[in-house]
A protein has these predicted regions:
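S-adenosyl-L-methionine-dependent methyltransferase catalytic core, i.e., the SAM/SAH-binding region
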Residues: 1-239
Length: 239
């Protein structure tokens, strides 16, 4: 076994460095790991006070503090909406910018208070923590998570032997959407318009879908590991 400290988006370079042209299987377990979430000092949690970090790899330069304190209001609004699916994105982005004009936003709980202040009373009464979506959005931006998933998916199929399988576990809908789309595209083959009588693009399917619908956790798994409640597994096999 060889352990490699790298981003899975670099799967081509990783395999090249190991002298491995192709493999019989790949399993990608996306998202933040439990040890990262449970270590309050990493800044992923909205339940404990810590510096605004959120880097999965501490060697990376961009931190949540830089995003919160330096990115333009419009860009903050975009990531909150696109990556967090936060309906109060405009209000939260504006509140962050007002707060940082007075003093830098330095900790997770400072950010939580700013987010709370921007949301209406009814939203604060919802079961979900008011900062959950915003923290997800900032974390995704810090780590370029969706870009990494896209690059990994586009590279991984090409490094599988015939009959090799690609299995990907996602933990939120944005990741799953990318994985589903990339697998379907690889399984589709021809991309000619439907009105064409014969194929002229020459594209052939690269994989077959092993799972038409994602596999989700059962009751026994959820009892043992509640964090698996949002996990989805999709599998494709190289042709």
């Amino acid at each position: 076994m060889t352990l490699v400290h790298s981003n899975f988006a670099e799967i081509d370079a990783i395999l090249d460095s190991l002298g491995i042209p192709a493999v019989d299987g790949m399993l990608f377990d996306l998202g933040v790991s439990s040890p990262q979430l449970d270590d309050a000092s990493r800044g992923f949690s909205y339940m404990a006070d810590a510096p605004l970090d959120m880097r999965m790899d501490k060697d990376d330069a961009l931190t949540a503090g830089e995003v919160v304190n330096t990115w333009p209001q419009g860009e903050l609004r975009r990531i909150l909406y696109d990556y967090g699916e936060e309906r109060y994105a405009p209000q939260i982005a504006a509140a962050i910018c007002r707060a940082r004009e007075k003093a830098p936003v330095e900790t997770t709980l400072e950010l939580v208070d700013i987010i709370r202040s921007a949301m209406p009373a009814q939203a604060l009464r919802e079961k979900q923590h008011p900062a959950k979506r915003s923290f997800q959005a900032i974390r995704i931006a810090v780590n370029d998570e969706l870009g990494a998933v896209s690059r990994m998916m586009q590279a991984a199929v090409g490094r599988l032997n015939p009959g090799g399988r690609l299995a990907v576990i996602t933990f939120h809908s944005l990741e799953d959407r990318i994985v589903k789309s990339e697998m379907q595209q690889a399984a589709r083959g021809c991309t000619c318009p439907p009105e064409f009588p014969v194929c002229v693009c020459g594209k052939k399917p690269l994989v077959k879908l092993v799972t038409r619908k994602p596999i989700v956790s059962g009751p026994a798994e959820l009892e043992e590991n509640p964090r698996a409640r949002s996990a989805k597994l999709r599998v494709a096999e190289k042709l």
